[in-house]
Amino acid sequence: MVSAMWDTSALKLRNIFEEEFGGYLEKRLRESIQLNRPTKRYLKLATRSDIDLKFHKVGKKESNGSSLVKYIIEFDTTAILVKGYIRPWNNPEWKCKAPYNSNQNVDTRSLYKEKIIVRDNVKDLFSAALTKLDLSVRLNKFDQNVHAKYRLNEDFLQPLGRTLRHSCEFPVMHSRLVQRESELYEEFLSYDLPKRQMTTMDIQFKTVKVQSFQQYKIQYIQTLTREKTSQEYTSSARLPHWQSNQIQNSSIKFLKLCCEDEDFHPLELYKLENPKADQFQRKAVYRSKPIKPKWRISDEIIKRLNWNPFKELNLPKNSELLESLRDVQVRCTSYALVFKRIPSSKIDLMVSKIPVSFRSVNAISYDQFDPKSKENVQESSQCIDSLANEETTDVDEVTNKRIMTSGKRSFINADLVSIIAAKRSKLKRLSISNGDVNPVATLNETVEQSTMSNVTFQLSDKSFHNAEEKVIIFNAEYIAKNYKLINFLHQNNFCVLEMDLGDHSDILLDASTCLILRNITSVYQKQVDSFPLLRAIQELKCKYKRVVIFLSYSERSLALDSNLAYKTQLLLNCLGGTTTHLVEETQLKLTATWISLYCGTNTPNEQQIYRMSLSKEVLQHFDINPIAIESILSLTSLEEFLSISYGKRALLYGKFLTEYQLAHIDDFVTMSWSE
């Protein structure tokens, strides 16, 4: 709204004009008036001129012909500006007792009681005016020099009756209560859980806070209309209770029971018995005899019917028609119980400082070993020499050296002791035939030695010859802990990447293998009722098919407990499916060698791993590692990967994905969308 204000600071008006023109002179009113160009030009000329401007009152029916006057009359205003001089009328002056000083400041708000001496002709004028009851005097008839107290107020005998001409209608405010009552809250909750859901998950439903109106009834129940009385009623509304007297007909009850019988015949429904007269409690109506039963068929048919139609009927029962019994020979076969074999972890033997080369001893069953069997010694020795000199990436074929003193075998059970004893005899025969160092003799010689032997390994410089082709991904969360190993791998030209894997693993070796680097003392750290390291390994087994654990130790820890390494191995064997290696803390080259042996050469490069796409983001939600994602997308597309069946997906991509990941993907694909 555009507002303007009349500037009347240059005008010298009396207080009487302030009462007549309201708030125009006090600058209290703001109006927006649309004027045409001639009127704007005329108003601008009138305000900038030096002439005296005067206000005069214009009635609704009067019009001076000016465009400004005509315009303001249309908008129902009470004052206009007129350019020009107005000649004052020569009105008779009132004579007062004391001379009036025009320079004296007189308060017009005070009331004066004075007597006015008038002549006889003036009295006649007043008497004639009183008969007409109209003493209205125009303001412009009097001179400005005449004081206001001698003037007669305009229309003082008639009520003005001023009302607001331009009323503003404000919109009615919307009731907040009515608006909230009209809103409906609809919620849908699924009644089933996803497949293969973990039972240990705590499911909590958040309550939806809806503002309730305790003093108002949303669903109002209309009661019966009552006459208006002065009695006060409670606000509780009760539903009317209609009492119904059910007629107990014995014949109908009998027919209902007969319908449940399998031998019931439909002809019984043709004959119905009317209720007795005493069951109807009517006023002044009594029946002496009950109503005779009537057939619901015509009389002609009744004559031809046999009155005892059920006497000669020999209908079979429903059970005889629908069911038949025969002897069937059933042979119950008992199925053999098959227990799933849990793969155990490997047992690593600690070796002495003397370099000894033989294969790592794996956990095998006692039934598979025959101590009386004889093998060709020459072929076995050649096989061991070839394994020691051949370069391979399979960790089971890598040669290493271990030592195991008698004090550190105290926890091993009887079956495992017999297996190790047979293995010793076999290695003894091999060492005698080849003339090499006998590991059993070495073990027997070190029984009386100190148990604080250093763990040494025979390393090969050929382990790093393909370092440029191997990509090792470190977890960005544990970079501060593994910075020494990262620097060592950088110096040997390995491609080292850093990514946030979102799990407890330290290194991602390939598409299905992860590596954990921990101290041996962290295995026995306990929180509340669980071991943090064991819980982390269980979580990693859901994401990776193979979990490799490197436990670093120091000579001081072995000096405190000689059986610490084997106790740790026994505890980790309970998990199953893990491979544990004991490495000395200072052996960075040894750790790098094992990491190089576990890494494959067909891993994607740095650009392929860091390049993100929509398909990779979808597969990341199923807890799949980056190398496995690249391997899957290199073989097929995302649409084809999700559209195939569960068995085909497990057959084609089972080497990258675990059973938990396959089940998670299958739950997502077979999910039902409810409205």
From Swiss-Prot:
Protein localization: Nucleus; Chromosome
GO terms of biological process kind: chromosome segregation; meiotic cell cycle
GO MF assignments: DNA binding; nucleotide binding
Keyword Cell cycle assigned: yes
GO cellular component, one term: nucleus
Keywords noted in UniProt: Cell cycle, Chromosomal rearrangement, Chromosome, Chromosome partition, DNA-binding, Meiosis, Nucleotide-binding, Nucleus
Protein family per UniProt: Belongs to the ZIP2 family.
Function: Required for initiation of meiotic chromosome synapsis. Involved in synaptonemal complex formation, a structure that tethers a pair of homologous chromosomes along their lengths and plays a central role in recombination and homolog segregation during meiosis.
Protein name: Protein ZIP2
Organism: Kluyveromyces lactis (strain ATCC 8585 / CBS 2359 / DSM 70799 / NBRC 1267 / NRRL Y-1140 / WM37) (Yeast)
